[in-house]
Amino acid sequence: ISIMLEEIGYDYKITKIDLDKGEQFKSDFKKISPFSKIPVIIDQKNNKTIFESGAILIYLAEQSGKFYDINNRLEINQWLMAQMGYVGPMLGQHHQFHHYNPGKSQFGEDRYFKISKKIYDNLDERLSNSKYLSGEDYTIADIGTFPWIARHKWHDIGLINYVNLTRWYKDISKREAVIKGFSIMNEKETIPKP
């Protein structure tokens, strides 16, 4: 979400929620995020609270008029929903079994490695036909998907083996707003090279 906020040039303030301390389960946070998940934004100007990253991206795109072309919304929504319902959850499970808890479940590691490889295959195939996920223009579908592929070293799949996905990744990695938004929570963190 920080990438989107940087892309549209909105002023914002970050409130860090310490997941290791369980701050996301406190009653005040549950009032704004019923599933105790991050991210959440509070739009002070419009007195709105929005949870779930896909909903936040759509909201910010509609408010700013950027990265969500009305003439391409069906395509954008399909690729954004693919990220929300498949790419993010499956790569997230891969992170849990392969990166955070290796050796705890061979079944889990094998299953999510195969699914993650399939995701890379699918994205690479899609990007063989278009510059970005939903066509020739950079959209919220790319903004939502990019941070998951930016963890490619955790996946041990070899991003560099996917020509089109690597081209897309490098292209997005050069955007000033992406560079700034990616490291906003940790200034020492930089976008990994392919």
Each model region followed by its residue ranges:
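GST-like domain detector, emphasizing the conserved glutathione-binding G-site
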Residues: 1-111, 124
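Short, solvent-exposed turn/loop segments enriched in Gly/Ser/Thr/Pro and often Arg
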Residues: 18, 140, 185-188
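Short secondary-structure boundary/hinge segments and terminal tails
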Residues: 22-23, 60, 170, 189-191
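Phosphate-coordinating loops and pocket residues in cytosolic domains that bind phosphorylated ligands
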Residues: 31, 174, 183-184
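Alpha-helix/helix-capping structural signal
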Residues: 55, 176-177
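Active-site-flanking alpha-helical
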Residues: 61, 148-149, 182
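GST-like fold's C-terminal all-alpha helical module
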Residues: 86-176
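Terminal-tail/helix-coil boundary detector
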Residues: 179-194
